[in-house]
């Protein structure tokens, strides 16, 4: 999805919700956050968002928007909820009729990327490390530990952070 497609999908979701007589709050993260909030990329495969309860009406509206705009059924999804270990720091990014879209903070976004530690997250993690001005693996891991339970962090996360720092030119 391009930035324009994501914005159109969110606006359409808000209209769908308003037409159903409901409003909703979502918290955006992932590639959509990198594109829409940070402006660090032009496209992403989907919009990852945490949906505030009740989610039933939101899921119905998402389905209607996906059909109307020809988007994949998971084009806007709440799969990220499994990575929210505590409520993330967030700010209102944009408000549409029927929909308020919040964005996680940059440090929370980096914590998610380091925790996921996927090769596909490297470029985003490098961008976030530079954006946040982090210079050491200790700084990165201390930030991650603010949001991810320490017991879930392994040496893999440290190595991923070290690799990202090196690529960012910070180590």
Regions found by a protein language model. Name each.
Residues 1-171:
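Compositionally biased terminal segments of proteins
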């Amino acid at each position: 999805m391009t930035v324009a497609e994501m914005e159109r999908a969110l606006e359409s979701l808000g209209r769908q919700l308003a037409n159903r007589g409901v409003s909703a709050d979502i918290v955006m993260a992932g590639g959509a956050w990198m594109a829409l909030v940070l402006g660090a990329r032009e496209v992403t495969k989907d919009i990852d968002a945490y949906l505030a309860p009740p989610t039933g009406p939101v899921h119905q509206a998402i389905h209607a928007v996906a059909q109307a705009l020809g988007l994949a059924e998971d084009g806007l999804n709440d799969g990220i909820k499994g990575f929210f270990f505590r409520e993330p720091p967030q700010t209102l990014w944009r408000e549409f009729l029927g929909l308020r879209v919040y964005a996680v903070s940059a440090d929370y976004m980096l914590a998610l990327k380091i925790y996921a530690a996927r090769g596909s997250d490297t470029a985003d993690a490098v961008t976030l490390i530079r954006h946040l001005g982090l210079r050491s693996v200790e700084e990165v891991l201390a930030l991650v530990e603010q949001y991810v339970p320490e017991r879930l962090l392994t040496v893999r996360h440290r190595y991923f952070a070290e690799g990202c720092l090196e690529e960012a030119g910070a180590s």
